[in-house]
């Protein structure tokens, strides 16, 4: 057993929300714990938001399903407009149990989408975390940059495998391309996002394989 000073310890309340990142008081019967006593001993009662975020990122790195208390605490911090919550935006930080994996906020939507295995409707058990999900970018429907991200997911996967995009994934690719085109016409896509498309194998050649745009132009000019 390891001994610590009180100031190095965290109270065991909802410890699963941050367990990998802190020394937690080894006392499981929390109902018998007196908060006043813990405070007198300089034990930290509530974990810092950064600690909970770091634990979630640890779960992402190890592929472990985070305990529901992790999202509960972050949801409470989102309701208080904690600025650190926004640091999760754009990262794979939401665990979808049906997929046994983490997805980005722009792969989850409040209403059903026709984007196959690349986007999902919010599962019923996660709807209670709406303040958190809204704060990190979960929306009702995809926007231009979301279509770009999903399109890059598709071509990145198939480019590595040197395989043509086919079947339902091809339908999703086409839908994303249309979504990007419509957003571009509305001038909703910035230059940096366009550059991401230009630098990736985003165009399908005659065989349906992802190809870099400049290579397609070279082939067409020959």
Residue ranges of each PLM-predicted region?
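Long, intrinsically disordered, charge-dense linkers/tails
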Residues: 1-222
